[in-house]
Regions:
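Nucleic-acid-binding surface
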Residues: 4-6, 10, 15-22, 26, ...
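Residues in the helix-turn-helix
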Residues: 32
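Glycine-centered, phosphate/nucleic-acid-interacting loop/turn motifs that mediate DNA/RNA or nucleotide
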Residues: 40
Length: 198
């Protein structure tokens, strides 16, 4: 397999996206990749991230490719899990305390910071509208995050998230209680459980 064929395979596996980091990890030089990008007419959509002309623009996926230390959370996680009726106006992420997220805030991303102990609690992955996989929190962690931040979101989004979770057939209630304890919203979660499940 030639290097061009190898890069074509990587581009296909990335749903039309490829990163300089992934290319150099495979032992392919940056000048060679630059020639490949020119010949395939790839568009540079972010520093080190290239997109083929036939790929759908996917802001969440590009943000993930540029920032491996973020987890999509809050309203973005609600959208990924189908727990809200409309797409959020901004992208919401969570980072670990100590992570410098200034560049994200400058891009209009809403950044939440948590301690390292709870950063990976409920970590999973989900598929964006355009078919790309990104890291996010599971439904239980997302519900707890929403309850914690209820004053910072509109009432309709909040109520829809609670209703969608509580009426959904697949709930992991023991995990929900663990998340609610870690995020200090256990009393609120138990109140909602009593209303919806009893």
């Amino acid at each position: 397999m030639t290097k061009f064929e190898q890069l074509d395979t990587m581009l296909e596996q990335g749903n039309g996206y490829i990163t300089t980091r992934a290319v150099t990890t495979q032992g392919i030089s940056k000048p060679y990749f630059a020639e490949y990008a020119r010949s395939r007419e790839l568009e540079r959509v972010a520093h080190g991230v290239y997109q083929s002309r036939d790929a759908w623009p996917d802001d969440m996926y590009v943000l993930h490719l540029r920032n491996s230390n973020i987890i999509f959370s809050h309203q973005s996680a609600l959208a990924l899990h189908g727990m809200m009726e409309r797409e959020p106006h901004h992208i919401y992420v969570t980072v670990k305390q100590g992570y410098n997220a200034t560049h994200l805030r400058k891009q209009g991303v809403i950044v939440h910071t948590v301690s390292p102990e709870i950063f990976t609690l409920g970590l999973t992955s989900a598929t964006t509208t355009f078919g790309n996989t990104v890291p996010t929190y599971d439904r239980e962690r997302t519900l707890c995050d929403v309850i914690r931040q209820r004053g910072a979101m509109d009432v309709q989004t909040y109520q829809t998230a609670i209703r969608e979770y509580m009426l959904h057939g697949h709930k992991n209630l023991p995990h929900l209680i663990r998340c609610s304890r870690a995020l200090k919203v256990e009393d609120d979660v138990r109140r909602y459980l009593e209303v919806f499940l009893l």
